[in-house]
Amino acid sequence: MAPDSTFVLLDGSRQTTADMKGRVTLVNFWATSCAPCIAEMPRLIATHNRYKAQGFDTMAVAMRYDPPSYVVNYSETRKLPFQVAIDNTGSLAQAWGDVERTPTAYLVNKRGEIVKSYVGEPDFFALHQLIEKLLADTPS
C-alpha cells in the first residue's frame, strides 16, 4: 500500500493518499536542480495530459532541499498541468521509502497500492502500457 500521506500543494491546499483512491496516480519526487527531472518533465506532462480524462493523476513532490520559490516559478512558467506538492520537512520522501535520488516515482493503482517504482527516468512506452492496464482494472 502507498503510505498514508498528506501532500501540501502549492496553493496551500492538502491532498491525502486516501483522496487518490479510485484513480491511478504517478507520485513523482523531483527537484528543480535535478537535470534528469527537468529533462523528463515534458514526457510527464504529455503522459498526464494523455490519460487524465480516463482517471489518471500525477502528483509531483518537490524535495525538501528545493527552494519553494524555485518550485513555484518552475511550475508557473512551465504551466504544469498536474498537482505539485512541496515536501518541506522531508517526511514524504521518508514515508515513501527514504527517497534520496531524483527522479523517483511510484505508480499507485486505484486501490492505493504501489504497483511499480522507478528510480531515474522511466521507460515511457512501458509506463503507458501499465497505466492503460491499471485504468482498465475495476477495483473490487
Predicted regions, residues:
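Structural microenvironment flanking redox-active thiols in thiol-disulfide oxidoreductases
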Residues: 38-78, 86-95
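Alpha/beta-hydrolase fold active-site loops
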Residues: 24-25, 56, 103
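Hydrophobic beta-strand core positions in alpha/beta domains
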Residues: 26-28, 60-62, 106-107
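Short active-site neighborhood of thiol/selenol oxidoreductases, capturing the structured segment around
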Residues: 15-38, 44
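Active-site acidic short loop of glycosyltransferases
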Residues: 20-23, 53, 81
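N-terminal targeting signals for export/organelle localization
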Residues: 1-4, 128, 139-140
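A short beta-strand-turn-helix
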Residues: 4-25, 96
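Thiol/disulfide oxidoreductase modules built on the thioredoxin-like
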Residues: 73-81, 86-135
